[in-house]
């Protein structure tokens, strides 16, 4: 009767019951409550609830009341529902741990790659750098060589052109020989006379240059110079005489019935004058001063530069002579309209200059000096 009047909480529990071996269910719940994902307060509550529930399950007594069993069942159900709820902190920790592992693995890969690069650098880099440097040096040398060659060719060409112009215009025999032939002519005729004379001069220089290269030691320069100077003097005398003859001739009246015949006669006369001009240019070119064209071309470092100098020297001679004769012909044509008989006077003057220069050249040979 006394046991029925005492409350259930006052019942004493034998110590032997606490020393009994725990069941597997108790171990499982204790392990689940020890996880780090639960907060500290909730962890303590779950431990208490699970211990109480396990205690009542392992130690059922006939003295326990139905209310106590119901309360324990309610506590067990609430603990199960709390454990089944998802925890967002747990997911975040999983993600953060995965990212940390990923970062560590990427760092390891970078570290291994750096070590491999350091180990392979002395083996692979020097041969590659040497091949690259060789290719760069060879390409740079080719580019620099091409630029130097182009510069050398252009410089030689312009030098030859100006040398030909100066050589032609600075020779008194050239000017004296072409003046009588170009006075009283139109611009086109004067240009043709100058170009023919320039081509003949170039041909004579080429002939002399080839003879010099072929014969060399056998070629006596002094003998050729002496006789060449005399021939030039004689040609000047002939040109002067022809100019005086042309100036002294009176113009004949033109007849209509004989117009075709006169035209044919004039064209034949022009052909003869053209051939004479070309031949005069050859004679003036067959002089030792042709070495002024040959020797610089031979002294240049490359054959291309020498060829460019030679070609431009010849072109400069033709252009200079054509320009000179066009200038003289244009001046005579312009003065013809204002001053009557100016053509005859200019022809007389230029012919006398040519004759005087020819005589001076020939006579100077006998006195031991040369004007040419």
Curated annotation (Swiss-Prot):
UniProt region (Disordered), positions on chain: 1-20
Transit peptide (first-last residue): 1-78
Alphabetical GO biological process terms: chloroplast organization; leaf development; plant ovule development
Organism: Arabidopsis thaliana (Mouse-ear cress)
Pfam family membership, one: DsbD_2
Protein name: Chloroplast protein FOR GROWTH AND FERTILITY 2
Transmembrane portions of the chain: 109-129, 161-181, 195-215, 231-251, 281-301, 309-329, 352-372
Protein location: Plastid, Chloroplast membrane; Plastid membrane
Domain of life: Eukaryota
Gene this protein is translated from: CGF2
InterPro entries registered for this protein in UniProt: Chloro_ReproSupport/MetalTrans, UreH-like_TM_dom
This protein's UniProt keywords: Chloroplast, Membrane, Plastid, Transit peptide, Transmembrane, Transmembrane helix
Record keyword Chloroplast present: yes
Membrane topology designation: Multi-pass membrane protein
Function (record text): Together with CGF1, essential protein which supports female gametogenesis and embryogenesis, probably by securing local energy supply.
Annotated knockout phenotype: Various vegetative defects, including reduced leaf size, dwarfism, and abnormal cell death. Plants lacking both CGF1 and CGF2 are impaired for female gametogenesis and embryogenesis, and have abnormal leaf morphology with yellow patches associated with an altered chloroplast integrity; this phenotype is rescued by sucrose treatment.
Gene Ontology cellular component list: chloroplast; chloroplast membrane; plastid
Tissue spec. comment: Mostly expressed in leaves, stems and flowers, to a lower extent, in roots, floral bud, inflorescence and siliques, and, barely, in seedlings.
Comp. bias (Polar residues): 7-20
Chief place of localization: plastid
């Amino acid at each position: 009767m006394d046991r029925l009047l005492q409350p259930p909480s006052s019942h004493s529990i034998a110590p032997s019951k606490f020393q009994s071996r725990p069941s597997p269910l108790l171990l499982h719940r204790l392990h689940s409550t020890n996880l780090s994902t639960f907060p500290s307060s909730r962890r303590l509550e779950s431990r208490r609830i699970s211990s109480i529930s396990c205690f009542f399950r392992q130690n059922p007594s006939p003295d326990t009341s139905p209310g106590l069993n119901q309360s324990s069942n309610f506590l067990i159900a609430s603990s199960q529902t709390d454990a089944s709820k998802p925890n967002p902190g747990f997911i975040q920790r999983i993600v953060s741990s995965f990212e940390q592992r990923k970062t560590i693995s990427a760092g390891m890969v970078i570290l291994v790659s750096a070590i491999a690069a350091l180990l392979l650098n002395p083996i692979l880099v020097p041969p590659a750098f040497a091949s690259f440097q060789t290719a760069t040096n060879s390409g740079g040398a080719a580019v620099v060589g091409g630029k130097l060659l182009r510069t050398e060719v252009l410089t030689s060409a312009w030098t030859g052109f100006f040398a030909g112009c100066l050589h032609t215009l600075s020779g008194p025999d050239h000017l004296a020989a072409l003046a009588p032939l170009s006075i009283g002519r139109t611009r086109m005729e004067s240009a043709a006379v100058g170009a023919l004379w320039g081509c003949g001069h170039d041909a004579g220089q080429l002939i002399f240059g080839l003879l010099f290269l072929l014969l060399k030691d056998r070629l006596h320069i002094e003998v050729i110079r002496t006789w060449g100077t005399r021939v030039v003097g004689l040609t000047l005398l002939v040109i002067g005489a022809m100019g005086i003859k042309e100036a002294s001739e009176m113009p004949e009246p033109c007849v209509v019935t004989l117009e075709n015949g006169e035209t044919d006669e004039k064209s034949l006369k022009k052909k003869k004058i053209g051939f004479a001009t070309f031949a005069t240019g050859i004679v003036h070119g067959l002089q030792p001063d042709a070495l002024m064209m040959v020797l610089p071309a031979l002294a240049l470092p490359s054959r291309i530069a020498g060829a460019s100098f030679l070609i431009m020297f010849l072109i400069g001679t033709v252009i200079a002579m054509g320009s000179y004769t066009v200038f003289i012909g244009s001046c005579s044509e312009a003065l013809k309209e204002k001053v009557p008989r100016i053509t005859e006077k200019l022809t007389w003057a230029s012919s006398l200059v040519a004759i005087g220069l020819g005589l001076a050249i020939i006579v100077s040979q006998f006195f031991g000096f040369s004007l040419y």
